[in-house]
Amino acid sequence: MELWDKAERLWTRVKNWKTVRGWHIWKLKLVDARLYFVSMFVGLLTGLVAVPYHYLLYYLFHLRSGFFASHPAWYWHIPLFLFSWGILVFVMWLVGKMPLIGGGGIPQTRGVINGRITYRHPFIEMVSKFVGGILSFSAGLSLGREGPSVQIGSYVGSLVSRWTHILKGEQKQLLAAGAGAGLAAAFAAPLASSLIVIESIERFDAPKTAITTLLAGVVAGAVASMVFPVNPYHLIEVTEPVFAFFVQVKYFLILAVIVSVCGKFYSSTMNAFRHVYAKVNSPAYVKMFYLVLVAYIISLMQVNLTGGGEQFLLAQAQNGSTQIMWVTAVMLLHFVFSVFSVSSGLPGGSFIPTLVTGGLLGQIVGLVGVRYGVIGQENVSYIMLVSMSAFLVAVVRTPLTAIVLITEITGHFEVFYPSVVVGGLTYYFTELLQMKPSNVSLYEDMIHAPYFKEEKRYTLSVEIMTDSYLDGKLVDELSLPERCVIINVHRDGKNLVPAGTRLIPGDQVQIKMDSQDIEKLYEPLVSMA
C-alpha cells in the first residue's frame, strides 16, 4: 500500500511537470540551442566578410606605403591624387544615398538593436559599407576598421535573421552576435567583442546576449587567426618597472589624471569640429579635395600615420623614438588629421585613431619618466599599453572592453592590473569632468540628423526570460510608463490578445512607445523581461 502511494505521488508529480509551462520551458531550451547554433553561423559568415575587409585594408595600406617609399617622380603623384579625390567623392555620394553606412557603425548598430532604426536593404547597405570603408581607407584617411566591421556583422545578423525566420525578440540577439563577431574579426579578440556589445551597444548585461556574442566572436576570431596567424601586437616587448606599492599607485594616479584631461580635450574637439564641419556649406567635392590634400601631405611626410596610424604606433612601441618633442608633434599631427577624417562622415571608425593617440600619449609620458630617471627606456612600451587602455576608457567609456582588449590583443597579462587601476581612476575622473562617451554623442547626432526620419511611435520587442520580473505576470496587472502599451504577445507561432494573458518564458512581447522614450525605457524594460 505504501509503495502504491509513492507511485501515485510520483505520477502526480509527472503530471504536474507535464503542464503547458513545463513542456514550454523544455521547448524554449531547444529554441535557445538553435539560437546559439545560428549565432555561431552568424560568427562564421561575419568572419568570412569582415576578415577579407581587414585583409584588403592591410594590403592597400602596404601598396600605398610602397608607392610613397619608392619616391616616384613628381608627375606620378598627380594621377594618384586625382584618383584619391574621385574615390572620396564617390564614397560621399554613396553615403548621401545610404546615410546609415557613414561613420563608424557602432551607433547605427545600437539604433537597430533598440528598435529605433531598421535595415531596409541590409545586403546592399553591407556591400556599400564594405566598399566605402575600403575606398576611404585607401585614400589615406585616419580611420579605423573596427566600426565598419561591427556594422558589417550587424548586417550579417540581420540577413541571417531574415533567412531563418527567427522570432522577433531574438533578432536583436543575432544583431548583437554579428556586431561582436565583427570586432572579433577586426582584432582577433572574442572576449572583448562580447564586452563591447554589453557596454557600448546593448548597454545591458543579458545572459543570452553574452552567450550569443561570445560564441559568434570565438568563431569569427578563429577565422581571423587563420588569415592573420601573427598578431603584430604580440611583437611588442613589455618590461614592467619595479616600484614599491604606494609609489606605483602615485604614478598610476598621475597617469590617470593626464589621460583624463587629454581625453576630455580629445572628445570635446572631436564633437565641436564634427558640428562645425556639418555646418560648412561647401559642396562635397570641395570638402573632399581639402581632405585628400591633407592626407596626401601627411603621406609624403610620414605614410605610417595614414590609415588610422596603427603601423606607426606599432613601430614606436617596438623600437620608438626617444625625442619627446618629435613624438609630441607627431601625436598632435595625427590628432588633427583624425579629427578631419572622422568628422567627414565617411565610412570608417574612430577606435584605432583613439588607441593610437592614447599610445603616443603614453609614449610621451614614458619618455618624460625616462628623462627624470623614474623608469628605464625598456619600460616605455609598458606605459604605452596602459595609456592606450585608459585613453579608450576616457573617450569611449567602456572600461571592461578597454582593459580586456589591450590584454587580449597583446597577450601581456602584466598590463592587466595597471590597466584596471588606471582605467578605474580614469573612469572616475572623466565622470567628474562630465564627459559624454563618444559613441553616445555620435548616436545622439545620428538620430537628430536631417536625413533621419523619426517616427512618432516605435515598437520594441522583448522576450520573457525564466524567473524574470514579468514571468508569470498578467498583462492587465502591469504598470507600464505613460503612453507605453503592450500591443501583442506572440507565443508558439500565435498572436495572443494582451488583455487577460499571463506571460510565460519565451513570450515575444511587443511594446509600443513614444520615440523620445526609447533610449530611456529600453534598458528598464529589457531588464524586467
Describe the function of each predicted region:
Residues 466, 471-517, 521:
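Cytosolic Rossmann-like ligand/nucleotide-binding regulatory domains
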Residues 1-450, 456, 465-466, 490-493, ...:
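Alpha-helical transmembrane segments and immediately membrane-proximal extracytoplasmic
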Residues 521-529:
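Short, compositionally biased
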